[in-house]
Structures are given as C-alpha cells and as structure tokens.
From Swiss-Prot:
Keyword Isomerase found: no
GO biological process per UniProt: tyrosyl-tRNA aminoacylation
Protein's name according to its UniProt entry: Tyrosine--tRNA ligase
Domain S4 RNA-binding, chain residue ranges per copy: 352-418
Residue sites binding L-tyrosine per the record: Y34, Y168, Q172
Subunit architecture: Homodimer.
Gene behind this protein: tyrS
Pfam families in UniProt: SYY_C-terminal, tRNA-synt_1b
InterPro entries attached to this UniProt entry: aa-tRNA-synth_I_CS, aa-tRNA-synth_Ic, Rossmann-like_a/b/a_fold, S4_RNA-bd, S4_RNA-bd_sf, SYY-like_C, Tyr-tRNA-ligase, Tyr-tRNA-ligase_bac-type
Membership in a protein family: Belongs to the class-I aminoacyl-tRNA synthetase family. TyrS type 1 subfamily.
GO cellular component assignments: cytosol
Enzyme Commission number, as recorded: 6.1.1.1
Length: 419
C-alpha cells in the first residue's frame, strides 16, 4: 500500500498540497521530510505525538525523517491555536527543554540504516542571522496582506498580536527553506493548525529556490473524542511522555480506558498494526466489547512504543495486583506508580496498635469507626484482611521497608510511608 493510501485509510490526512505530485514523489523516490516541535515545555504529551507518528510511518515506508526541535522558534512562540500572547521563557529554560525533547524523540525513531532519522535544531542556522539580513533576505519575500489573511494571524487581530508572534511564520518558513536547500527536504508535516505556516514555507521555497522547486505540505486532522472532550487529557491533566510526569502505569491506564467509540480510530492513528489486525479488533469491539481486546492491544502497543517492553510488563503487573488485591507482589517503585493518586500519609517509624494507627493517620475518623471496620473485616493491610483489634503494626507490615498499603472496603486505598 502506498504510504499516502495508508495515511488516508488511517484517517490521518486533513489537507495536502499537490496530492498527485506527492504521491508520485513518494512512489518513485526516497524523500526527506520533517516535522517540528517547539520546546515550550520539558516534555511532549500524547497530542504532540500524532504528527511524529506520521513521520515514523514514512520512515517505515523507506523515507528519511528529520526531527526539528525549535530552539529558535521556541524563543518566540507559535501563535497557532492561541488566543493570547505566550509568555517568553528564558534561553536557559529553552535549552533544558530542547535536551529533554531530544531524549523523548530519540526513542521514537531509528537513527541507523538507509532511512536513518536525523535531528536538527533551528537555532543552529538562525542564531547568526542579523536583523538586517532577516528583513532584507526574508522579510522582503513576505506580503503583509497575505500574512494577515492566514488563519493563525486573522484569528488574533481583534485581541491583538505582537510583531514577534506575527513574524513566527517567517521563521518557520525559513526552516523549511533551509532544510530544502541543505537536507533535500521535500515535505513538511504538521497539525491542522499549521497549514498557514507550512504554505508560507512553500511560498518562500519557490521564491528562493525557483518556481520549479518541488516541495509539499501535509496536515493531520484535529483528533477529537466521541464524548466531545479534548483528546490527550485525563482527570489528572495532560498525559505526558515523560515517565516522571505520567508514570508508565498511568500511561497504560489512559489507553485502557479508551471509549469503545474511539478505540478503532486510535488504533489506526497510534499503532503500526495492519489493516487486517485492526479490522479483527474492530469486530471484537462490536461482538465482545466486554473483553476490551482492542483497548488492551492499544494500551500495550503504546506503552511499549513510548516507554519499553519492561515498562509494559510493570504496568500489567500493577494492574493485575490492584484487580486481585495481591499488592504484596509489587516493588516499591511499582507501588509509587500504581498508588500515585491515592490519599497518602506519613507514619512514625515505630510500632503501634492497628486501631490507634488508623486513627492517628486520619484513615479512620474515630476509634469507634476503626474498631467497627476492623471487626467487620473491612480493613486490609498489604492485601490481607485484618480483624485482630489487638494487632501491632510493625516493620513486618512494610513493603521493602518503605510502604504500607491500606484498603478499606473493596476499592478505597491509602498509601502510608514512613519518616
């Protein structure tokens, strides 16, 4: 299947320039193509991942991806999709963010072989451009009326836009032109809000490289959820690729909780499963939705891709332990992942009567309630029911001498650490 046909089947094309020309190029040649991200934060979230998944699909089809981290454009801020001016970050923070993104993006692509990926930073070719060079060599090529008509600018005219953000599309166009000239880059990929920036780059390439210059643009549809909420968010906020911000277990759980109405679409967007494999999972969604086979496959594929096989195994282990209640099998690291969002308490490093211990920590509101819950078998320590009112909590009740997991009833968990 032609890569363009595959992207259309996956529902991953929103707009493209010269569809016939691009099809011919990718059929007949190995092309270089790029997608960029600005270092506005120290981690990508799963929404950022979408265009880079397309870039990876091109690599799998034998083409050469260029990953651009915007050390220069990140100092300005892309106005696309923003209702107000971005707050400028320090150069020091931007440099730190660049390095963090390099690490994350480095896990997604193959940097060896005939279709080896490369990673670039637009600061390298922008830092020495003087203001006079910028105005003479590039500003002269842009018509203000055309710039004002771009959606990214037009949507901000009423509330106002600074010259800094107004000029962003020129900088991004400079990137495409530079990569065309020095890396033979023929295609830019971006989200649906990047159409104006991409076409600005194509215009600049034609003016700088000649009318016969062959370059293309392709944008991806905005991914929406069936319930109308924003994709990539959970109750706890954005789903990050950085495991310190979103643990692999939380990452896995996000995908496992995908709505039946969305899961086939996500399988097409985010996994490298074949059409036949996805069709089979789609049938199971229709006939055996309670098995959640599609969600389990999606969660497994994404956790492996973004994190690792080991991280997936850990997420599965945590899920199984929480479902069965056998939490003693978990390591301290797995406990921190699986119980990140439960109420947490810090206990004294000393022995104490179970009833007193529960009340002192605040897990139980009173001794009367604590005695009642213990006596009724509603209290579990590390997965084991405790009904002994005289039980003494000591070091043997700690997992790896760090944590005690308390469960009240069927689902209410508490995590206790020690001073």
């Amino acid at each position: 299947m032609n890569i363009i046909d595959e992207l259309e089947w996956r529902g991953a094309i929103y707009q493209q320039t010269d569809e016939e020309g691009l099809r011919k190029w990718v059929d007949e040649k190995q092309i270089s193509l790029y997608c960029g991200i600005d270092p506005s934060g120290d981690s990508m979230h799963i929404g950022h991942l979408i265009p880079f998944m397309i870039l990876r699909r091109f690599q799998n089809a034998g083409h050469r991806p260029i990953i651009l981290v915007g050390g220069a454009t990140g100092t300005i801020g892309d106005p696309s999709g923003k209702k107000e001016e971005r707050k400028l970050q320090s150069m020091e923070q931007i440099s730190k963010n660049v390095e963090s993104l390099r690490v994350q993006l480095g896990k997604i692509f193959d940097f060896e072989g005939d279709s080896a990926a490369s990673m670039v930073n637009n600061y390298d070719w922008t830092k020495d451009v003087s203001i006079l060079d910028f105005l003479r060599d590039y500003g002269k090529e842009f018509n203000v009326n055309t710039m004002l008509s771009k959606d990214i600018v037009a949507s901000r005219l009423e509330v106002g836009i600074s010259f800094t953000e107004f000029a962003y599309q020129i900088l991004q166009a400079m990137d495409f032109n530079h990569l065309y000239e020095f890396n033979d880059c023929r295609l830019q990929i971006g989200g649906s809000d990047q159409w104006g920036n991409i076409t600005a780059g194509l215009d600049l390439i034609r003016k700088k490289q000649g009318e016969n210059a062959k370059a293309f643009g392709l944008t991806i549809p905005l991914l929406t959820k069936a319930d109308g909420t924003k994709f990539g968010k959970s109750e706890g906020g954005a789903i990050w690729l950085n495991p310190e911000k979103t643990t692999p277990y939380e990452f896995y759980q996000f995908w496992i909780n995908t709505d039946d109405r969305d899961v086939v679409k996500y399988l097409k967007y985010f996994t490298f499963l074949t059409e036949a494999e996805i069709d089979e999972l789609a049938k199971q969604v229709e006939t055996e939705p309670h098995l959640r086979a599609a969600q389990k496959t999606l969660a497994a594929e994404m956790t492996k891709f973004v994190h690792s096989e080991e991280a997936l195994e850990q997420a599965l282990k945590i899920s199984k332990a929480l479902f069965s209640g056998d939490v003693k099998a978990l390591t301290a690291d797995e406990i921190e992942q699986g119980f990140k969002d439960v109420p947490t308490f810090v206990a004294e490093d000393s022995e104490a009567n179970l009833v007193d211990w529960l009340v002192t920590l605040g897990i139980e509101p009173s001794k009367r309630q604590a005695r009642e819950d213990v006596g009724n078998g509603a209290i579990y320590i590390n997965g084991e029911r405790q009904q002994d009112l005289e039980k003494i909590m000591d070091a043997s009740d700690r997992i790896e001498n760090k944590f005690t997991i308390v469960r009240r009833g069927k689902k209410k968990y508490f995590l206790v650490s020690y001073k």
